[in-house]
Each structure stands twice: as structure tokens, then as C-alpha cells.
């Protein structure tokens, strides 16, 4: 944890929050430790934009969960710090939501085993938030609750916050762009029974590892998650962007290959530090699903689905591109300056989307399906009055502007 402490001190000096050490000094030792780790893993912008009370509340609530909730106690420290303690999921506005969500669900979850508790949390999420397209801005978890709707990125951010508030390690997973159709999608992974499982946020099912997107996920070229802090041991890392680490989750959903690329200069020497974009055709543009920087040997690699890709590399004003078929694993050699894009002519290309079919989805039993149907009927019957009443009760506990 020495590196985290050094990172905290560096960002403290960078942001100039002189009152923060005094606030931490007034906390119990373990709460202060968690708060410092939380700050250390957060972008400097969050230090400046987010009231300290949000970070301190997250630390105090995470400590309570660690000491009092069985599934939180069982988590390895890296998972607890990155996926329970930390307030940030993606690029949403941060707010002090964890105590609010826990207060709403504590009694409802009492006595439930892990998986049943996760499913119950997702039912609660569905009772309060439904899918509706919005703009590209991601609202805070409490703002989504107040509105009662959100796009998939907001639903998944909301559900991750609710799961973390109840002591589960949870994260948002994201397909930057589909290869077989336009647009993208985000959903949730939760740590349950010692393994990661997926679910559609605010889309309750009778079992985990089941959602409308099962087949689509099996056709993804890339599925990734974000980690603020240290990723779990053994994670397949794509790269780091500031304080966020991108982890590759594709192999959990689709048939994959390890595609390697070697970048050289015009003299055949390895080109270190060149960015390689792995691009997917979507919405009439080549979208960089992932960008990997070459190492000292000029090599870059990505675990990806079995679909066509456009590779684009650039360094020092020079570039090169190539198209790879689903069967290719490389190494694909790209020579900087040898083949720059030529917009003055048309070239035919043939692209293939992944076939899909690899998602290991669960199949509910007959009793599970019956229970799910009964719960959904009950929810639909009570929606108009019960949801309004519950939402009103929760909003009374919110003391901060949204």
C-alpha cells in the first residue's frame, strides 16, 4: 500500500486540499485508511469536484459492510477496495448514495443467501428505474433514482452503486461498439460465490448469467470493464488511461483469439510507444474499440472476438493500417510510413462479424421461472402506487442536490 500512500500525497499536493488531512485525522483509523485509499485511486478532478463528505461517507459505509456483512468480509482486499469501497463506476456525477440504498434494502435482504440477495437487489432496481434513452451525459445514481429512468449506461451505473451499497463487489461491463449491428451496450458483473457473474441492470431474471443480450455478447469483439485502483490479480489488462485501468472481459462471453501486432519503422526496427487502434465498423465509422501501446519490442496484443478488425497505428506523424480477418492471430506487421491512408481512391473490403454462441448463460429451473413470474405479476400490480410510495420515502432521506 506504500504506492497508494505516495499517490495520495502526490494528489493532495496537486489539488491543494489543505483541509483534507484535518478531516481524515478526526476519523477512526480504519475509516481514515479507507478514505485515503479511495482518494488515492480517484482522478484529481474528483478531488476538486466532489465534496469530501462523499468520500468519507463511502469509507465509513464500506468499513461497516466489511465488519458486518458476511459476503463483504469474504472478499479479497483488492476486490473490496476497487469494487465495494470506490464511489466511481464510470463517468457519472458522484453523490453520497450508498447509505440511502443500503437503508432501503437492508430489511429486504435480511437472511437471504448471496445469489438470492443479488437477484432481489436487481428486482428493487427494476422497481425504481426503467430503460429510456437519454443524452450522453451520465447522471448521478441519485439523479437516476429520482428520474426513474436511464439509458443502459445509467441503469448499469445505478445498479452497480446499489450492489456496492449492499456489500457486493460489482462493476459495469461495456461493449464499446457491436460488430454485428450499430450501437453499444453496458451491463453489470457481480462477485457471487467466489466468481464473477453477469446480469442485465434493472432487468430482473430468475437466475444470474442470463439477459436479453446473451447472444449479442457472444458476438462481441471486445467487452471491457473499468477499475479505479489496483485490478485483481490475473486480470487481462488492456491499458491505463489516467487513473482508470481497462480490463478485458471478452473471454467470459465470446470465443476469442490473442491477436498480436508488430510495429516497425521504415528500416524494420521495432517502433516502441506507438499506439495501435483495434477498430470496429459501427455507425458508418471505424471506432477504436481498444487502443494498445507497443512495448520496447514494438509488440502490442489484444484478446478479442473472432470478427474483422481494422488496425491503425501511428507515431511521430507516421501511420499505417491493415485489415485482419477473423482467423488471423498474427503477428500482423505494420510498417510506419509505408502505407498511409489514401482518401483519394476507393478500396473494396470484406468484413465478417463474430458468429457468436459462446456465452455460458444459465437456464432457470421450473420453480425459478414460476417464482419469477409471480414476482413480476406482483410488481406490475403494485407499480403505480407502491413504487411511488417507496420512491417518495427514499427521496425524503436525500439531503443533497441532485
Task: Annotate each PLM feature.
Residues 103-123, 132-142, 147-239:
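Hydrophobic/aromatic-rich core segments of domains that either
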Residues 1-118, 122, 165, 196, ...:
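N-terminal accessory/pre-domain segments preceding catalytic cores
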Amino acid at each position: 500500500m506504500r504506492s497508494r500512500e505516495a499517490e495520495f500525497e502526490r494528489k493532495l499536493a496537486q489539488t491543494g486540499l489543505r483541509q483534507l488531512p484535518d478531516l481524515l485525522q478526526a476519523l477512526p483509523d480504519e475509516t481514515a485508511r479507507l478514505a485515503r485509499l479511495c482518494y488515492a485511486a480517484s482522478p484529481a478532478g474528483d478531488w476538486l469536484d466532489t465534496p469530501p463528505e462523499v468520500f468519507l461517507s463511502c469509507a465509513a459505509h464500506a468499513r461497516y459492510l466489511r465488519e458486518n456483512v458476511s459476503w463483504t468480509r469474504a472478499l479479497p482486499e483488492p476486490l473490496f477496495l476497487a469494487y465495494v469501497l470506490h464511489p466511481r463506476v464510470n463517468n457519472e456525477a458522484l453523490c453520497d448514495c450508498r447509505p440511502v440504498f443500503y437503508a432501503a434494502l437492508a430489511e429486504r435482504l435480511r437472511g437471504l443467501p448471496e445469489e438470492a440477495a443479488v437477484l432481489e437487489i436487481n428486482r428493487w432496481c427494476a422497481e425504481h428505474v426503467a430503460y429510456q434513452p437519454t443524452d450522453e451525459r451520465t447522471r448521478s445514481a441519485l439523479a437516476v433514482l429520482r428520474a426513474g429512468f436511464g439509458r443502459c449506461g445509467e441503469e448499469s451505473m445505478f445498479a452497480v452503486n446499489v450492489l456496492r451499497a449492499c456489500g457486493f463487489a460489482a462493476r459495469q461491463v461495456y461493449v464499446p461498439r457491436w460488430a454485428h449491428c450499430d450501437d453499444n451496450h453496458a451491463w453489470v458483473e457481480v462477485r457471487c460465490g467466489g466468481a464473477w457473474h453477469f446480469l442485465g441492470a434493472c432487468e430482473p431474471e430468475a437466475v444470474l448469467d442470463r439477459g436479453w443480450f446473451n447472444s449479442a455478447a457472444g458476438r462481441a469483439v471486445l467487452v471491457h470493464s473499468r477499475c479505479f485502483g489496483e485490478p485483481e490479480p490475473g486480470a487481462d489488462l488492456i491499458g491505463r488511461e489516467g487513473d482508470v485501468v481497462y480490463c478485458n472481459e471478452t473471454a467470459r462471453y465470446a470465443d476469442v483469439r490473442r491477436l498480436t501486432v508488430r510495429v516497425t519503422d521504415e528500416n524494420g526496427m521495432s517502433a516502441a510507444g506507438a499506439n495501435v487502434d483495434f477498430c470496429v465498423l459501427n455507425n458508418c465509422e471505424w471506432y477504436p474499440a481498444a487502443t494498445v501501446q507497443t512495448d520496447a519490442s514494438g509488440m502490442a496484443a489484444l484478446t478479442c472476438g473472432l470478427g474483422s478488425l481494422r488496425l491503425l497505428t501511428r507515431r511521430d506523424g507516421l501511420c499505417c493500417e491493415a485489415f485482419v480477418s477473423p482467423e488471423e492471430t498474427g503477428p500482423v506487421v505494420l510498417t510506419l510510413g509505408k502505407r498511409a491512408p489514401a482518401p483519394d481512391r476507393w478500396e473494396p473490403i470484406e468484413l465478417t462479424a463474430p458468429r457468436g454462441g459462446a456465452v455460458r448463460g444459465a437456464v432457470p429451473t421450473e420453480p425459478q421461472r414460476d417464482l419469477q413470474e409471480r414476482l413480476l405479476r406482483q410488481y406490475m400490480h403494485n407499480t403505480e402506487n407502491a413504487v411511488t410510495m417507496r420512491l417518495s420515502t427514499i427521496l425524503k432521506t436525500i439531503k443533497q442536490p441532485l
